């Protein structure tokens, strides 16, 4: 089967990763239209040899023409349009650089192959991988359903056989007592014993049949318990474990976890069958008490059967007690498992055995670090108390689906203060954002004469005392849940394991896709890989340490990779979300790549990218222009940070940005958003209409005010147009200029002044204070 066909059969979790591989550089439509031909070419060789790359590129254009002819015959107007547009784009972008398209296609094919290998590994492991394919999950669930149906049928069949045995035993008991009574009378009267012997033989035959029936039932019960054990192992060790792993992935931004209802139905069905079987085993005890004999199989095997069924039911109930929603502060729903002292957090537990008789019977108690208190003290970790409503009764009324659950909405943590300021050991090896703590939930179940202690734990949480610790705390949560499925390893960061770039890349993309509508493309991830690992061709399998990811400063920078990236994520969510969702922000792109794609474009073409030097997160635009001699120049403006974007939206900055030459003529250098989208088309809808910016003047006022608006201007000189400043701190002076009418001071490190002008909209000219 062709690679592309195999990819389309994967689960949606994998398809999400597949979508991230493709962008405008290599459209997915082209991959779809020419799948067999693309897979038959040696793109890796073409990426290293220009003559072969040129040949393959021209062959690609020929294949596009042939496919266009097919669509023409089919009268498929939409596909004709898309294919023509794709060809024009490829010619304009790669005609002079065929090796570039070869590298892109080679990397996409390699990533596709890696994706298939991951899916195949999940299939071989029987669904215990993070994201099994849809086919594996469906087949496994169907088999599980069949096994559960088989268990239920066998339980019902045994129920019928138990009735048959009971009737046979009653007949035997009646005949035996009757014969015994008659035998006593005959002994008194001295009558012939022949009739008695005949009836004794009949009783012996009945006893033999009864013994065979008992042995058959005991054997079937043993087989039934083995079948239950197999189904239970599948449910708890595979299905439930897989759900818990998916919950971990969902906590760090991965695909949303599936609901527990189906798993609850399966576990409830098995629990009901186990209780019914336990009653059948108890029935055997009653039968034994009425009739027993030498070699009775009930006497020999019933205690063992009773012990097995009770153990199975206990273990099932313990496994069925889960944390449905991990601890999370309501103000930070996208960052669960990070809790700030003194701030309320919520969590929810659920029992996946839906017995109505347990409604309002189970009282849940919450505590923290129950089993790790001594360990925590040894390693110098802080200790906490849980405040608020830390006990609650499970009920079925609070859940929409009637599940047996308890939601805690008003919990807070308070640190236990010690003499040295809270930490039990001043020589603690871990910083506070690497300390892991467990929140424990406990209850007791009394059901049908059984007492079962239930206990479950949250995933490890990080407790912070200041919100500025959130980025590093979240990095700890990412690293832990990315690399382990052990739910209780609180000593994880004493020796944090190493991750691979493939793992890190997936998690980084989730940080965007979970809070926006767009993850990271393969090109964006490659740029991030260069930031972390340095220049390279193939980053797959490259190892990344915890220190490299979060603690060590990047080369030539005074901050770590994660601090830089986390601030960019925050910038996207709070200030430029709509533009990011539209795909207008290229974001992560190297300066070499930026120059390469802009140098072939007409003057005025610009792109939007994130700053590589701003610790707090910044976004800038880079455009192409021609100098006096006609030479192509690539210019960038100093990045805009959150402080500046608080005063003016990025779309309005782009729409109003101007360059002022020595003669005070204002020119807009931004015309087309890369590759060729008119600026007004892309950003106009995100700017406020002038009627909203300038309400009508009061008719009763003596003289109406002139309408004004702020624009961002970079002053320059004719002799130095090729040296446009990298730092127009335009919005830093916005409020000052608006208040006193004076221009901004020259930027501290810039060669030129950066001004925000107040434009007179009536005369359409700049009112310069200079």
UniProtKB/Swiss-Prot annotation:
Keywords of the record: Acetylation, Activator, Acute phase, Cytoplasm, DNA-binding, Nucleus, Phosphoprotein, SH2 domain, Transcription, Transcription regulation
Compartmental location: Cytoplasm; Nucleus
Record-listed Allysine modification sites: 601, 615, 631, 685
GO biological process terms on file: acute-phase response; astrocyte differentiation; cell population proliferation; cell surface receptor signaling pathway via JAK-STAT; cellular response to cytokine stimulus; cellular response to interleukin-17; cellular response to leptin stimulus; cytokine-mediated signaling pathway
Domain annotation SH2: ranges: 580-670
CDD domains per the UniProt record, alphabetical: SH2_STAT3, STAT3_CCD, STAT3_DBD
Gene3D superfamilies the record matches: EF-hand, SH2 domain, STAT transcription factor, all-alpha domain, STAT transcription factor, DNA-binding domain, STAT transcription factor, N-terminal domain
GO molecular-function terms, A-Z: acetylation-dependent protein binding; CCR5 chemokine receptor binding; chromatin DNA binding; DNA binding; DNA-binding transcription activator activity, RNA polymerase II-specific; DNA-binding transcription factor activity; DNA-binding transcription factor activity, RNA polymerase II-specific; DNA-binding transcription factor binding
Positions carrying N-acetylalanine: 2
Essential for nuclear import (motif): residue ranges: 150-162
Modified residues (Phosphoserine): 727
Induction cue: Induced by methicillin-resistant S.aureus infection in the lung.
Modified residues (Phosphothreonine): 714
InterPro entries given in the database record: p53-like_TF_DNA-bd_sf (IPR008967), SH2 (IPR000980), SH2_dom_sf (IPR036860), STAT (IPR001217), STAT3_SH2 (IPR035855), STAT_linker (IPR048988), STAT_N_sf (IPR036535), STAT_TF_alpha (IPR013800)
Modified residues (Phosphotyrosine): 640, 705
Annotated effect of mutating residue 78 to A: No effect on nuclear import
SMART domains recorded: STAT_int (SM00964)
Modified residues (N6-acetyllysine): 49, 87, 601, 615, 631, 685, 707
Additional record remark: Involved in the gp130-mediated signaling pathway.
Protein family according to the UniProt entry: Belongs to the transcription factor STAT family.
Function, in words: Signal transducer and transcription activator that mediates cellular responses to interleukins, KITLG/SCF, LEP and other growth factors. Once activated, recruits coactivators, such as NCOA1 or MED1, to the promoter region of the target gene. May mediate cellular responses to activated FGFR1, FGFR2, FGFR3 and FGFR4. Upon activation of IL6ST/gp130 signaling by interleukin-6 (IL6), binds to the IL6-responsive elements identified in the promoters of various acute-phase protein genes. Activated by IL31 through IL31RA.
Subunit field text: Forms a homodimer or a heterodimer with a related family member (at least STAT1). Component of a promoter-binding complex composed of STAT3, NFATC3 and NFATC4; complex formation is enhanced by calcineurin. Interacts with IL31RA, NCOA1, PELP1, SIPAR, SOCS7, STATIP1 and TMF1. Interacts with IL23R in presence of IL23. Interacts (via SH2 domain) with NLK. Interacts with ARL2BP; the interaction is enhanced by LIF and JAK1 expression. Interacts with KPNA4 and KPNA5; KPNA4 may be the primary mediator of nuclear import.
Protein name, UniProt field: Signal transducer and activator of transcription 3
Source species: Mus musculus (Mouse)
Lineage: Eukaryota, Metazoa, Chordata, Craniata, Vertebrata
This protein's encoding gene: Stat3
